[in-house]
Regions:
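Oxidoreductase and adenylate-handling cofactor-binding alpha/beta cores
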Residues: 192-212, 229-236, 278-286
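Short, well-structured beta-strand/strand-turn elements
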Residues: 51-54, 325-339, 395-400
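Glycine-rich beta-alpha junction loops
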Residues: 58, 148-150, 219-224, 261-263, ...
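A glycine-rich dinucleotide-binding beta-alpha-beta segment and adjacent secondary-structure elements
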Residues: 318, 326-375
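N-terminal helix-loop segment corresponding to the beta1-alpha1 unit
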Residues: 1-208, 380, 386-409
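Mid-domain beta-loop-alpha active-site segment that forms a flexible
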Residues: 185-200, 219-227, 269, 273
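Aromatic-enriched alpha-helical interface/lid elements that frame and gate functional surfaces
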Residues: 252-327, 331, 377
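Conserved Rossmann-fold dehydrogenase catalytic segment
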Residues: 151-152, 177-184, 207-223, 242-249, ...
Length: 409
């Protein structure tokens, strides 16, 4: 049985600093842009993989130019930075036959384990990245492509378009209000997580069979796969599923309430928790027989929420949290992002990535499981050309200069 790591072995000297993780020794070559694939490969980097971004020097990842200018470098703006820590970067013009030849040579010489892309499918042949072509170069390669709607559909897609298409917006926002997108690009992030799991499964399968794989991730299918309950309830079981704002369709009280100095979210999930809430002096007036069971609370949810609003209005947030938590009632402060970063359960596991040139430090949340890895600062455009082309292909400065003049790298 072969190892899960690639035949390329350990990451070479000078590779981004990272804690040795499960995927140490796995090399990923990623033709990536925007959010979903960069987040997927960021997750792989967090687990120890060597991730090398591939970009066209003349038309790099558009996200490099999005956000605030925090470094005085036009191709290193703020929105690009978070999802690209822990990576290396090269430039390569895959629209030129010589660029395609270099890609194939890199796959062989670096012992690339995973090639990933999130281009539209109509570009595959033009760029020379079709799965059959690259698997012919290295038969145990894992080829991953992320598209909006699958490899047989070339429609352009971005996260909010897919939130609309997948029905997310129908379920998000105030009841009676307009459809609303999430505050996070959940379709991008969800497709990245699904792609990540498929890569890890393919690496395991290859370790047992020696075979490569083609993985096609449809962002639409990824998003709809989360809609298990809404689709089953609405299409098969006769339920009307629609926007509820901060409420829950089946449980009450579940809502946001204003306090004297902020907001709290109260989520009572069963009758025992309701009894615990109404045992508190502040809420004792709500301990009426008609509210004892969840069905009764749902039947008068408007009146119930108005009464709870009165109970919370002159309570301080800290006082509300302390009393309800002590009673075993699920409740949380509605946190600002500053609150989240300061939360002791978060703060002790933040990762900090520093730019060796400017000293700028970026705080990142740690992966959900395991120790926070140490990651390098996001790479400049083509930052590792000399190292990687020299390491893998023996190309010296003069040859690289010639390739730059010809717009190949």
């Amino acid at each position: 049985m072969s190892s899960i790591v690639g035949r390329g072995g350990e990451s070479g000297p000078g590779a981004p600093l990272m804690a040795r993780g499960l995927l140490a020794g796995v090399t990923v070559l990623s033709l990536e842009q925007a959010t979903t694939l960069p987040f997927l490969t960021y997750r792989l980097a967090c687990d120890g993989a060597r991730v090398i971004r591939v970009e066209n020097a003349e038309r790099p990842d558009p996200n490099r130019f999005v956000g605030h200018d925090v470094l005085g470098e036009p191709a290193m703006r703020s929105y690009f930075l978070p999802n690209n820590c822990g990576k290396e970067a090269i430039t390569l013009n895959l629209g030129h036959p010589d660029g395609q030849a270099l890609l194939r040579a890199l796959i062989v010489k670096l012992g690339v384990d995973v090639f990933a892309c999130n281009q539209r499918t109509r570009s595959y042949a033009r760029l020379g990245i079709e799965p059959q072509r690259l698997l012919a170069v290295k038969s145990d390669l894992i080829w991953l492509g992320i598209t909006g709607f699958g490899p047989d559909h070339d429609e352009a897609a971005y996260d909010p378009v897919l939130q609309a298409r997948a029905g997310f917006m129908e379920l998000t926002g105030d009841a009676g209000g307009p459809p609303t997108v999430f505050g996070l690009p959940m379709v991008d992030l969800g497709a990245a997580e699904h792609g990540y799991s498929e890569v890890v499964k393919a690496l395991y399968r290859r370790a047992t069979t020696g075979e490569g794989a083609r993985i096609d991730v449809s962002m639409l299918r990824s998003a709809v796969s989360w809609m298990v309950a809404p689709i089953a309830l609405s299409s098969s079981l006769g339920e009307r599923v629609a926007r509820k704002g901060n409420r829950h369709q089946f449980f009450a009280p579940v809502a946001v309430h204003r306090t004297r100095d902020g907001h709290v979210y109260l989520a009572v999930g069963n009758d025992q928790q309701w009894a615990a809430l109404t045992a508190l002096p502040r809420f004792a007036g709500l301990g009426r027989p008609e509210y004892a069971a969840n069905a009764g609370r749902i039947a008068d949810v408007d009146g119930l929420d108005r009464a709870l609003a009165d109970c919370f209005a002159d309570l301080g947030t800290g006082e509300a949290l302390e009393s309800l938590r002590r009673a075993g009632v699920p409740v949380s402060r509605v946190s600002t992002l500053a609150d989240v970063v300061a939360d002791p359960l978060v703060a002790e596991r933040l990762m900090h990535v520093a730019d060796p040139r400017s000293g700028l430090r970026i705080a990142l949340p740690a992966p959900p499981v395991g120790e926070p890895p140490a990651l390098s600062f996001p790479p400049r455009l083509g930052e590792h050309n000399e190292k990687i082309y020299g390491e893998a292909l023996g190309l010296g400065p003069e040859r690289l200069a010639e390739l730059r003049r010809r717009l190949i790298v």
